[in-house]
Amino acid sequence: MANNMKYVKELLQTDIGTEGQLLIPRKIHDTLIEAVDKNLIPRSEAALYFGPGDIPGSSIDVDLVTPNTMDIRVVGEGAESIIDQPAYTSFNMKPVKYGVAIRITSEMMEDSKWNLLQHSVMTAGKRFAENETSLILSDGLGNYGNSVTGGAAITIANITRAMQYLDDNDYTPTTLFVGMEVLNDLRNIDTFVEANKVGNTDMLQRGFLGTIYGLNVLKFSTNAAPSTTYSAYAYVTDKMHAYAIAEKRTVTIRNFDLPVNDMSAANITQRIVVKELRANAICKIITS
């Protein structure tokens, strides 16, 4: 009897004693703690958005006037004017289907502390939004016309040079997209921290400066980007000309049952594509 009591005592005093752990009362929190929402790129930054009603078939053609075409020339007295006309280009946007399927057994639905199907659908909605940001970075902003290569940290000169690339092509810089490493660099630039230089204390109070040289600063999550290397990238854009989004099917949820498998299920899909509109309206800043 004494040996048995000693064995139980040892279990209660060790981290690996399963029996001891079971004797300790535990409260299981009945509210599911959600994952934090990521910083995503809003649709308002797209120059054009084509919804399902704008795309009668499987794709849509976008027509553009080629910049700086059609010249005015000197014409001599009595001479014939030279024929010229604007040039045009066109590209096609064909939405790609993305989707995820959810299957929950009836036993899991009955025994779970929360509605697993409903929560899974809600989480899927977030993943679709994150996928859209990834597409914007890779297929929209990723097809930039010019780039600035900086050093280990972004500098003011990098930002202003990127702005100049847009100015040189007659675009108006409106937005600065920054990865998290670049955001950290901005926090360490005195010009954006000291109130007597920047005119406010936003960076000190909130750790974020919403406007730099008239650019609307938007940070994007590394975990929503195509890869972690995007954390060291920034993009200066003219939001009126940078990229377009075509969405043939909005995020669509189809609920159904699988009686043979005794499951509740949902199929969630979206048809969407992102493409640059004017490459020279985008300048990428690369840091190491």
Residue ranges and their predicted role:
Residues 25-98:
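Assembly/oligomerization interface modules of large self-assembling protein complexes
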Residues 2-13, 23-26, 89, 189-288:
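Sequence/fold signature of self-assembling virion shell proteins
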Residues 141-209:
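Extended, solvent-exposed, turn-rich assembly/linker loops in the middle of proteins
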